[in-house]
């Protein structure tokens, strides 16, 4: 009985153990991300503090309202849960004109608050990215004028469970086999004990 419990605990521990990435390293190294500006914007990126943080600067080159995005994107080949802290500021009249956030496959999720202060911050945790998703940090500008906004991403982390990988490693099946063996031994002993009574 005790051996079965130990084996089951070991199985649960091994199956839920995560491979982790801290900051912009490994598969999330800044060299693996794509930098893009849309619609002729003059946004930019500051990677000098990488791997600890990256900063996206929005566009501010328009004399007429021109929407433009500054986008920092990656397409992982493995499923990940990611987390990060974000800090935002704008020199525009209002955060409304320069929303910041992230997108998954082009679907934008705004983090900055249009009605909030010129400086804002927050954190995102346990955001699921599945293999093949295009994930991007985005600093948008609705007018590309009157003042530039920026968003800094720090404390980036990513974890992947052995079961969320695209192709499970053979080693990940070992804890499962051990768990099934423990249940089998326990069931066999119970059945045998019942028959001898």
Mark where each language-model region is:
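Sec/Tat signal peptide C-region and signal peptidase I cleavage site
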Residues: 15-19
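Hydrophobic alpha-helical segments, especially transmembrane helices
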Residues: 3, 187-191
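Bacterial N-terminal signal peptides
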Residues: 6-13
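Cytoplasmic C-terminal tails of single-pass
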Residues: 193-197
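Mature extracellular "passenger" or substrate-interacting domains of secreted, surface-exposed proteins
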Residues: 20-166
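Positively charged n-region of N-terminal signal peptides that target proteins for export
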Residues: 1-3, 169
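A short, hydrophobic C-terminal helix/tail in secreted or cell-surface proteins
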Residues: 169-188
């Amino acid at each position: 009985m005790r051996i079965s419990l130990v084996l089951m605990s070991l199985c649960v521990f091994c199956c839920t153990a995560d491979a982790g990435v801290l900051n912009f390293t490994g598969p999330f190294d800044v060299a693996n991300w794509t930098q893009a500006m849309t619609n002729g914007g003059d946004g930019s990126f500051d990677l000098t503090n990488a791997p600890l943080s990256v900063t996206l600067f929005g566009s501010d080159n328009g004399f007429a309202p021109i929407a433009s995005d500054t986008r920092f994107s990656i397409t992982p080949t493995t499923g990940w849960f990611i987390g990060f802290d974000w800090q935002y500021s704008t020199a525009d009249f209002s955060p409304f004109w320069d929303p910041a956030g992230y997108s998954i496959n082009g679907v934008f999720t705004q983090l900055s608050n249009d009605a909030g202060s010129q400086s804002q911050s927050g954190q995102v945790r346990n955001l699921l990215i599945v293999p093949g998703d295009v994930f991007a940090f985005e600093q948008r500008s609705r007018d590309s004028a009157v003042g530039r906004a920026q968003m800094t991403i720090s404390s980036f982390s990513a974890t992947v469970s052995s079961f969320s990988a695209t192709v499970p490693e053979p080693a990940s099946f070992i804890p499962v086999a051990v768990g099934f063996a423990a249940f089998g031994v326990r069931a066999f002993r119970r059945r045998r004990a019942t028959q001898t009574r």
